Amino acid sequence: MAQRYRPRLLEVKVIPIKPDQWEWQVCEDDTPLVMGYETTRETAQIKGDSALFRLLSAG
């Protein structure tokens, strides 16, 4: 019997740490694959999105 393909579900999370510090994570099933810290929410979202697209383009 053939194995069923299970697509990966990746998501970007942006988490407030302090008023001037935000953590971004690219996660699969609540497991962080890549993470980083930024000083604004907008920058954290952009960096998280960029990391997600780099992972997707790598295959």
Segments and roles (model prediction):
Residues 29-43, 58:
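A short, exposed loop/beta-hairpin motif centered on an aromatic-Gly-Thr core
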Residues 21, 30-31, 50:
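Short linear motifs in intrinsically disordered/low-complexity regions
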Residues 49-59:
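Short arginine-rich
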Residues 1-21, 53:
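Short N-terminal "domain-start" leader segments
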Residues 44-48:
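Stable alpha-helical structural segments in soluble proteins, enriched in small hydrophobic residues
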